[in-house]
Amino acid sequence: MEEKYLLAEELKEERNYQRRPHICGLFFFLNKGEINMKYSESLKKYHDFQKVYKAGKSYGNKYLVMYVVENQKNCNRLGISVSKKVGNSVVRHRLTRLIRESYRLKEEKFQCGYDIIVIARVGAKEKSYFDIESALIHLGHLHNIIYE
């Protein structure tokens, strides 16, 4: 029993050692000597979404709509919205995961300091990862928030 407790304490210490706060939008893993890509936060609060909807500029394509507004931080905040019109919970969650993964893998191309909301349209329901990724990159280019 005592051995399990010590193991749990060691794991907690290791986790605390691995994750450090982001500096200038970067996230570090110190134990492996690797630098992970930029660190983004999520938009979760209703009033944060409302600020972006009211003050932000929007562009859309066949599959996605993107609202963007500058924030006063050194990292991006991403919010994803998938309406019930798109499909049942399995479909909505799949689209959310595709959008989040597309953003995560292309995150280094996006400029820092923006609140971004991505809304999935009904046409995105049956699309592949590559279609969603290209739609997201296209909208980033329209907003001029992607490095060339």
Where are these regions (language model features)?
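Positively charged, solvent-exposed patches that mediate nucleic-acid binding
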Residues: M1-E148
